[in-house]
Amino acid sequence: MLSRVGSLGLQGIEGYEVSVECYITNGLPNFDVVGLPDTAVKEARERVRAAIKNCGFRFPVSRITLNLAPAGTKKTGTLYDLPILLGILSASGALRLPKERSAFIGEVSLEGKLRGVTGVLPMALAAKAIGFKALYVPEENVLEASLAEGIRVYGVRDIQSLAAHFSGACPLKPCPVWRPGEPEGMLPDFSDVKAQETAKRALEVAAAGGHNILLVGPPGSGKSMLAKRLPSILPDLSTEESLEITKIHSVAGLLSHRNPLVSHSPFRSPHHSISAPGLAGGGSNPRPGEVSLAHRGVLFLDELPEFKRDTLEVLRQPLEDGVVTISRVAGTVSYPSQFMLVCAMNPCKCGWHGDISGRCRCSEQSVAQYLGRISGPLLDRIDIIIEVPALDFSELTRREPAEPSAAIRRRVEEARNVQRQRYGGTSTHSNAGMSPTQMRQYCGLSPECESLMHAAFDKMNLTARSYDRVLRVARTIADLDHSPEIQPMHIAEAVQYRTFRLDGK
């Protein structure tokens, strides 16, 4: 007999339909799985065989052929255990599947219990788009799957409860759409940071325009503390943005079972020992890397010169294109990676170069060599470079309260609303992503501004890319100032954010 069971697969962060076809015929007992299965899918034969027997069903002593269609696409993971098991039971006549169009995903243990799998949300959204009426997933994935509104989602504990549901003896109840409750924790606040008003202003500009920023300063000056508070002034995520981020984290297996929706801008801070595939994504079965896990959020690289140069170079494509592409023999996958790059570093090996205390003992050659670990093309992609000096005693003991994140965030949201209206109907989300055409349209300069930019270009030896980034930052400063046109003071502030020299002089 022949049976077909609906299931789903993953390509990047998008799901697609997979049909599990099972054909049982007379002949020498054999169990073949075709349709480009990987090792985990092939091993499903033994898991399914044991689960069927341990759940009280009879495993067919026949020739069994399973095809995972489309046969030309590689199938990976353990999520096909459940549809394979149901296909065998249906083809052998031991179980009658529902007539309505349903999809099944889940790993099956040897005793017949269902275990969670990764990537459930993108597959659930695909199931809804394809036209499935019901989706059956392991219990631990049911809240995540319920985020796909418009399809009935059932959480299944084991094969026996699923069989009872099909027979009508004990129907399962569909899971209601999960809604987020109260936030689990407060984000770190800028009111905790003493002084450093210039750095705070630079981070406000960066947040308002989505600009990349580099913080340079001695140990203990507050670089990491400032960077970790950046998410607290970023605008709220839209529903579409939250779902997009959640899909990426679902594929990476990083979602909480109790709180499956990513509702805040991500903040990722990998260690400097991370490899290039760990940063960009990769593996034999590609998975998202840190640049994708930081999508719509912040990627913080502390101690920037300590990262391997080849690791940092993989940032160039996602910083320019907002997407990272991973090519393998089995195919190519792309992951979105539109993030704010926030970097922090010391000005030399000991960390005290240029400090008025005179504690630095590094030679000029040593300083230049240390700073030279960062390539020019990568620095060109950083919009704002700001110095974070060490604090003196009077600044540390200042009693005046610092401005809270909520106040800064209101200004950032106002600037982002201006940009949202400006770029409505285009793929651009913020000033940092302006195309050359949009720059000509929205970054027109008066003769006074042009003169100021000309002087900065000549004096600072700016590249064409650096010139464009100064203009983008100036446009953001104008938005924060509620100015429809870029003024000389906006240019002056934007140029100030490029004056710190990373050449050890």
Predicted regions and their residues:
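Short beta-strand elements
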Residues: 18-24, 279, 383-386
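Walker B catalytic acidic pair
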Residues: 296, 302-303, 314
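Hydrophobic anchor at the beta1->P-loop junction of P-loop NTPases
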Residues: 215, 301, 344
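Peripheral, non-AAA+ core regions of ATP-driven protein-machinery
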Residues: 1-214, 218-224, 327, 466-467, ...
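Basic, amphipathic alpha-helical bundle interface domains used for macromolecular binding and assembly
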Residues: 34-45, 58-60, 67-77, 286, ...
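Walker A/P-loop
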Residues: 215-256
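Conserved alpha-helical scaffold flanking the Walker A/P-loop in AAA+ ATPase domains
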Residues: 204, 261, 266, 273-299, ...
